[in-house]
Amino acid sequence: MRKVIYILSLSIVALMFSANIIHAQCGADAQANACISKLQDGFTFLKTFKVDGQGGAKAKVEYSYVFSKDTQYYLNICNDGADTDGIVVTMYDSKRQVVSTNYNKGKFYAGMIYPCNATGIYYITFTFEGSQNYCGGSVLGFKR
């Protein structure tokens, strides 16, 4: 009986350890870098963003960036799964008012363009709506 309990305990520990390894293998760096080539024509690359929801343990990933007035910004999303895999991108101005999102009426869009009309700090949040992988990458580009 002790052997059975011991083997069962070891199996549970091994399962928990392997689950943690799976979460750690998001590959957000590679996905963000792969996103660069998918930047829309006419936009100049600015920055990549890693989107690692740690297998669902993290509900939100947030970044900030200074945007300039009279500049258009393009933000795209990439991942290994289908389309955006439930990654919702929401952009907020310095007053935390929503100015743009890639999710509208139940549909996810792989990219969004934001025409900036006020220079300031903008917040870019990535959340997960029915995501399978909780992992992806994103690229920010601009044009004047």
Language model feature labels by segment:
Residues 1-28:
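Bacterial Sec-dependent N-terminal signal peptides
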Residues 1, 12, 38-40, 44, ...:
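Alpha-helical structural elements
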Residues 44-50:
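A general sequence property marking short-to-moderate contiguous segments
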Residues 27-28, 50-135, 143-144:
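Acidic, Ser/Thr/Pro-rich low-complexity intrinsically disordered segments
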